[in-house]
Amino acid sequence: MTSRTRVTWPSPPRPLPVPAAAAVAFGAKGTDPAEARSSRGIEEAGPRAHGRAGREPERRRSRQQRRGGLQARRSTLLKTCARARATAPGAMKMVAPWTRFYSNSCCLCCHVRTGTILLGVWYLIINAVVLLILLSALADPDQYNFSSSELGGDFEFMDDANMCIAIAISLLMILICAMATYGAYKQRAAWIIPFFCYQIFDFALNMLVAITVLIYPNSIQEYIRQLPPNFPYRDDVMSVNPTCLVLIILLFISIILTFKGYLISCVWNCYRYINGRNSSDVLVYVTSNDTTVLLPPYDDATVNGAAKEPPPPYVSA
């Protein structure tokens, strides 16, 4: 009985890859260089593409974080600008103690600008009438000539030199009132300053009169005695008690000073209104370095720069 034994021959070894140059030398068809480069690029791009795909969520996350950071910085800058514009006028202006008395309205519920125009026109009319009277008196002295008996002794009413001075003062007052009216109408604050200075000077003179009456009450009696005998109500005033006369005169001067002070405040408020209207608003700009805002973080820039690798080198056949 014969037994069969199975003999297994070893498989032939796998042929080694022949280099392209040797294959061409022996007449075999070698691999195309372009195909070799493309296959090698695909083999090398496999891990690289896998790495890029793995880093894609991280890049997207960093891009979203960078975009969110830019939006947060932009909103912060806008809020800072708005807050600076809101607080800049109050912070840059010096608040004076008399600011609480500032108002845009005056008597008869009219605007301070309208009140200043009316006040300037009123003073202009009064000084024009005074100027006409003085000019007519200078042209015809006999019309305003008073005899010594009418004036009560050696009392000279007004000579030519005083008349010329009064005419010059009236002309100056007409010019000042016209400037104030024009400045209030055309909203030019500098034109109102001379009229305001005149009001301050007039107020100071009235204050000096009040102080003189308060310190020297007997001067009133002496002044009344110097008046002509035919002066209206001269004897009635002389018969009044000196103390009561002083109190009446002080009360009258106080009313005049209060009224003049109110007119001064109206003109001053008009000046402030026109000056504030013509002055440009203060703009506050919050500047920042735009390059630091727009540039990405350093880590993201280095990661993105490392991801962009150069293409594989060209291999000649």
Curated annotation (Swiss-Prot):
Start-end of Basic and acidic residues biased regions: 32-59
Molecular function via GO: ceramide binding; kinase binding; phosphatidylinositol bisphosphate binding; ubiquitin protein ligase binding
GO cellular component, one term: cell projection
Region span, Disordered: 25-73
Main location: membrane
Span list, region Required for NEDD4 interaction: 205-221
InterPro entries: LAPTM4/5, LAPTM_transporter
The record's account of how the chain is modified after translation: Undergoes proteolytic cleavage following delivery to the lysosomes. Ubiquitinated by NEDD4.
GO BP of this protein: endosome organization; endosome transport via multivesicular body sorting pathway; negative regulation of lysosomal protein catabolic process; negative regulation of transforming growth factor beta1 production; regulation of lysosomal membrane permeability; regulation of lysosome organization
Pfam families with a match to the protein in the record: Mtp
TM stretches of this protein: 117-137, 163-183, 191-211, 244-264
Membrane topology type: Multi-pass membrane protein
Keywords annotated in UniProt: Cell membrane, Cell projection, Endosome, Lysosome, Membrane, Transmembrane, Transmembrane helix, Transport, Ubl conjugation
Effect of P312A: Abolishes binding to NEDD4. Increases localization to cell membrane. Retains association with HGS and enhances PIP5K1C interaction. Does not affect EGFR degradation
Record's subcellular location: Endomembrane system; Late endosome membrane; Cell membrane; Cell projection
PANTHER family: LYSOSOMAL-ASSOCIATED TRANSMEMBRANE PROTEIN, LYSOSOMAL-ASSOCIATED TRANSMEMBRANE PROTEIN 4B
Role noted for this protein: Required for optimal lysosomal function. Blocks EGF-stimulated EGFR intraluminal sorting and degradation. Conversely by binding with the phosphatidylinositol 4,5-bisphosphate, regulates its PIP5K1C interaction, inhibits HGS ubiquitination and relieves LAPTM4B inhibition of EGFR degradation. Recruits SLC3A2 and SLC7A5 (the Leu transporter) to the lysosome, promoting entry of leucine and other essential amino acid (EAA) into the lysosome, stimulating activation of proton-transporting vacuolar (V)-ATPase protein pump (V-ATPase) and hence mTORC1 activation.
Assembly notes: Homooligomer; upon reaching the lysosomes. Interacts with MCOLN1. Interacts with NEDD4; may play a role in the lysosomal sorting of LAPTM4B; enhances HGS association with NEDD4; mediates inhibition of EGFR degradation. Interacts with PIP5K1C; promotes SNX5 association with LAPTM4B; kinase activity of PIP5K1C is required; interaction is regulated by phosphatidylinositol 4,5-bisphosphate generated by PIP5K1C. Interacts with HGS; promotes HGS ubiquitination. Interacts with SNX5.
Similarity-based family: Belongs to the LAPTM4/LAPTM5 transporter family.
Protein name: Lysosomal-associated transmembrane protein 4B
Organism for this UniProt entry: Homo sapiens
